Design a protein with these regions (language model features):
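Short acidic amphipathic segments
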Residues: 73-88, 318, 505-521
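Short cytosolic juxtamembrane segments of multi-pass membrane proteins
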Residues: 3, 400-419
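Interfacial "coupling" helices/loops that link adjacent transmembrane helices in transporter permeases
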Residues: 8, 12-18, 294-334
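N-terminal Sec/SRP start-transfer signal
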Residues: 1-32, 329, 333, 417-458
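Juxtamembrane segments of multi-pass membrane proteins
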Residues: 62, 433-566, 574
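Membrane transport/envelope proteins' first extracytoplasmic loop
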Residues: 2-293, 302, 321, 361, ...
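Small-residue-rich transmembrane alpha-helices
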Residues: 293, 297-302, 309, 333-365, ...
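Hydrophobic alpha-helical membrane-associated segments
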Residues: 29-36, 288-296, 338, 342-346, ...
Length: 593
């Protein structure tokens, strides 16, 4: 008897292949979208982890106000847990790029070695071979490129040459995007990064030390285990640096900082991008699973209704409820499994690569790294199968409780009854016959009605969300440069200037309506003294908060009322307050860079 029922199940799949494909298709789309988008965050982070490991990105970086010499490096390198330590000289200078004065950051680099920490990779041209040559970080398509052969005039007492010729372009794990460290030179924003030979610097002290930690490379760098290894070593380095304070006591004070990757902007910024993709995967795929349940419920309900007589025959022949329900559950199970497996394959092969390449317009993570996603695939398929099996069981449960005699007879139509509109004669009498039948059927088949409403509402919500995202993004520009930035022209002083004399010079210009001068500098904000989490911030100082509001519109996040910078205290952005859990009257310190 069981063989006959199994044969009948596969015959049913063949005879109603269109229905089978409808369940198969919606499960495929739902699972593909879920696994593809959900795994994108994991792929992005693991690709970055591989890129960092292959190019020896630092685990710890160390700064001091007096720099470091070889003896300092040797002492700190003996700290328990330190694997490698290297000293690098770095300065920020101003040069002319594309007819604009821009601030560039210059790092020393040992081009004779192919295993440096923060190893750079040549993407175009060659490495420097002669004095006065440099390589520049390659932006890809993120900005206007600096061509090979460009001479950059750079005058600084720390450099032996006064100009540097760009002979190559490189990528570096130290910077993944066009967002660099802050600086006190020029505008406070670094525009380009150059690498020159160590011999090009006149001094013999290093400005920063980079170190790797034993065993850290074996761990996933965005996981807790990685930081469980790095953090104790960082604390030991800080303890070991106490001896250096005695060495440099005669200089009037010694300041030492040891920072891990959580204090490095590029590392944290890329993690945040992956987290955003993960957040999207928690919302949108839910709709596809809901639609899959509705499609399965509708399809199987209709199939069960059509085979009412067949179910009665099976019950009359002695098949129990479980065996009969198993036929339809197997039908939905096979469609869900097939769609789920193929959806996982297609989702993992398409979405992660598309999303990774899209983000790589901004970030320079070299290669896409594939990571096993078995648990995620199993979860996605199990959810789809469970939803469809439950929907199938719900569709046939009520019919299986009836006796064979009732099932073998045609199903009695539902009792007719008046709908609400029939009680409103001046509306109902204007309906023709077709409209009256439609109105009655809407309330007669409530399940189908609500499933249709839910499906249409979900599709409309997705379309509306797409247009909403598009409009929100396009509105950012008009809000930013129409409402927030009310000024037409912004300029920067190359050096400190007398405000009053500047006003006197330009107040007679009829083309200028008003001028306001403020002071701003870059800095870092710390969540607390006990934590290393920092954020780059712009600190603005004004002498007249009301006048400043006429040039830059500030509003409170909740009330949307106009905000004015107070004479005593400070205003912070909503995002900074949220990230650091700040409340009114809180005190926080910031450090100038």
């Amino acid at each position: 008897m069981k063989k006959a029922l199994i044969k009948d199940t596969f015959r049913e799949i063949k005879n109603s292949f269109g229905r089978f494909i409808s369940i198969f298709g919606i499960v495929l789309v739902g699972v593909a979208f879920f696994t593809g988008v959900k795994s994108s965050a994991r792929y992005m982070k693991y690709s970055a982890d591989t890129y960092f490991d292959n190019n020896n990105l630092f685990d710890l970086k160390m700064y001091s106000n007096v720099g470091f010499d070889d003896a300092d490096i040797e002492k700190l390198g003996k700290t328990e847990g330190i694997d490698r330590i290297e000293g690098v000289t770095s300065i920020d200078v101003i040069t002319n790029v594309h007819d604009n004065d821009e601030t560039v950051q210059i790092f020393s680099y040992d081009f004779s070695s192919d295993d440096n920490l923060n190893k750079i990779t040549l993407t175009e041209g060659r490495f420097p071979e002669n004095p006065g040559e440099c390589v520049i970080r390659d932006y890809g398509i993120a900005r206007e490129p600096i061509e090979l052969g460009t001479e950059l005039a750079i005058k600084d007492d720390n450099l032996k040459s006064t100009s540097y010729k760009v002979v190559g372009k490189v990528s570096t794990p130290y910077y993944l995007s066009y967002q660099y460290d802050t600086t006190t030179v020029g505008s406070g924003k670094i525009s380009d990064v150059l690498f020159i030979s160590e011999d090009e610097f006149t001094g013999d002290r290093y400005t920063v030390l980079f170190a790797t930690v034993k065993g850290a490379k074996d761990e996933y760098c965005y996981g807790d285990t990685y930081f469980d290894i790095v953090t104790p070593v960082k604390e030991k380095v800080i303890e070991n640096a106490d001896d250096l304070s005695e060495k440099y006591a005669m200089l009037g004070g010694y300041t030492f900082y040891a920072l891990d990757r959580n204090s490095h902007y590029s590392f944290v910024d890329y993690k945040n991008c992956g987290d955003r993709m993960d957040a999207i995967a928690k919302v949108f795929p839910a709709f596809f699973y809901l639609v899959a349940a509705l499609v399965c419920l509708t399809t199987m309900t209709r199939m069960v209704d059509e085979q009412r007589g067949g179910i009665g025959t099976l019950k009359a022949l002695g098949y129990n409820k479980i065996s009969i329900a198993g036929k339809y559950i197997t039908y939905a199970l096979l469609a869900s499994l097939a769609g789920g497996v193929l959806g996982c394959v297609l989702g993992l092969l398409t979405f992660p690569r598309i999303i990774f390449n899209a983000w790589n317009v901004v970030y320079t993570v070299a290669d896409f790294t594939e990571v096993p996603q078995i648990s995620m695939c199993v979860l996605a398929i199990m959810i789809a199968v469970l939803i469809n099996v439950l929907a199938t069981f719900a569709s046939c449960f009520s019919m299986l409780t009836e006796t064979p005699a009732l099932l073998l007879r045609p199903k009695s139509p539902k009792n007719g009854k008046k709908v609400l509109l029939e009680h409103i004669p001046f509306i109902w009498k204007h309906f023709n016959f077709t409209k009256k039948v439609t109105a009655r059927n809407i309330l007669r088949y409530k399940k189908r009605f609500f499933m249709t409403i839910t499906g249409i509402a979900g599709c409309t919500a997705l379309i509306l969300a797409g247009f909403g995202i598009k409009n929100s993004i396009s509105k950012v520009t008009s809000d930013q440069y129409g409402t927030i930035f009310a000024y037409d022209i912004a300029g920067e002083f190359s050096e400190a200037s007398d405000k009053d004399s500047f006003y006197d010079e330009y107040k007679e210009n009829k083309n200028i309506k008003d001028i306001y001068i403020m002071t701003s500098h870059m800095g870092t904000a710390k969540k607390s003294e006990s934590e290393d989490t920092t954020k780059n911030v712009t600190i603005v100082s004004v002498d007249d908060g009301k006048r400043y509001s006429g040039f830059t519109g500030l509003t409170y996040h909740t009330s949307k009322e106009t905000a004015v910078i107070p004479e005593d205290g400070a205003l912070v952005t909503y995002k900074l307050a949220k990230d650091f859990n700040l409340k009114e009257n809180d005190n926080r310190s910031e450090e100038h860079t």
